[in-house]
Amino acid sequence: MIEPRDELGTATTDSAQKILLLGSGELGKEIAIEAQRLGVEVIAVDRYANAPAMQVAHRSYVGNMMDKDFLWSVVEREKPDAIIPEIEAINLDALFEFEKEGYFVVPNARATWIAMHRERLRETLVKEAKVPTSRYMYATTLDELYEACEKIGYPCHTKAIMSSSGKGSYFVKGPEDIPKAWEEAKTKARGSAEKIIVEEHIDFDVEITELAVRHFDENGEIVTTFPKPVGHYQIDGDYHASWQPAEISEKAEREVYRIAKRITDVLGGLGLFGVEMFVKGDKVWANEVSPRPHDTGMVTLASHPPGFSEFGLHLRAVLGLPIPGEWVDGYRLFPMLIPAATHVIKAKVKGYSPRFRGLAKALSVPNATVRLFGKPEAYVGRRLGVVLAWDKDVQEAKKRAEMVAHMIELRTRSSDWHDQNYEKRKHLL
């Protein structure tokens, strides 16, 4: 692991600090932009050319990140100061080997290994971190899945043991849904579905993400700093809108910090963790953990001061730089600048060379802006952009973000124009 840092070099010179992004989506793009602002050299890797982060990196490589030899060829050539996984589909053996050879994997290889596998993560949350979660069971056959769902009770959730972005998950309302849940896990998981986890349904008030960041303080000690919890909702298992602050009780907020601290202390390392939780009244349950910036955390591009979005916080931690904070009742808190919200811009069709219109109207709305990710290909449900909005009232920010997102239309080379109004579930307007 790196040491506390007081100096930085200059990109593309022999004094440069280098970061290697394994995954080059919209989250990696924002990390790269923050790195550019500090003169850090950026190398971006992904499975396809011209991925978002590649468009703002110094160099890029295209290849299969499940291929250990490919990853080693890049690492040996670039010799990065930090290797930053941005996605789940990465060869884990390679990450452990990089650490063994003295490379800094963010936050560490073990945390990545745990977080991307739901059984390892759930056992870590319950047995090591000792934090509350929903009840759960595992199934490896269809008969076991019927039995597990019956014991957990309906409704419940089934999820492939290794996946991301809600792929391979299903909301099971009764026994008649189980064959579909089995098929969903086996055919759509982004990873492995040799085992399926069945989770109790929590009738929560709000789903939140705590963006806990482990970093060196001004004295060179590792501390954890907590921004305000981010509220969000999902549609079909994928993030659709987020806002900060999350509008939860003071007691629940302190429990969020307590749970996030226990989890990140167990996982260790340096960097930002997106810790997903359910909140109902004053009760909080841990759900999942992402050992990297979180899609719901894009709201911090508006709600936090410049340079201190979740991406800026992650980069500071990775580089060994301090992050300001204030101790309040035993927790180190990061101040929010203004309440803000996000709303996604998603594709309804498949095709290349996406185009967007309605921007003149959208960009005329005060206290809102549009971020387009620059993805060269669209497919149904793919996130191609996001709207950021801010207001002294977080409810107004949520409405504004939603309103502006629904002003945007998009098309591809092979499709007609379509708007965002095809999806209105959970919307405010």
From Swiss-Prot:
Q: What is its EC number?
A: 6.3.1.21
Top-tier EC class = ligase
Pfam families attached to this UniProt entry: ATP-grasp (PF02222), PurT_C (PF21244), RS_preATP-grasp-like (PF22660)
| Keywords associated with the record | ATP-binding, Ligase, Magnesium, Metal-binding, Nucleotide-binding, Purine biosynthesis
| Keyword NAD in record | no
Q: Which residues bind ATP?
A: R118, K159, E199, E200, H201, I202, E207
Q: Which HAMAP family match?
A: PurT
User: Which family is it part of?
Assistant: Belongs to the PurK/PurT family.
Subunit relationships: Homodimer.
What protein name is recorded for this chain? Formate-dependent phosphoribosylglycinamide formyltransferase
Per UniProt, what is the name of the gene that codes for the protein in this document? purT
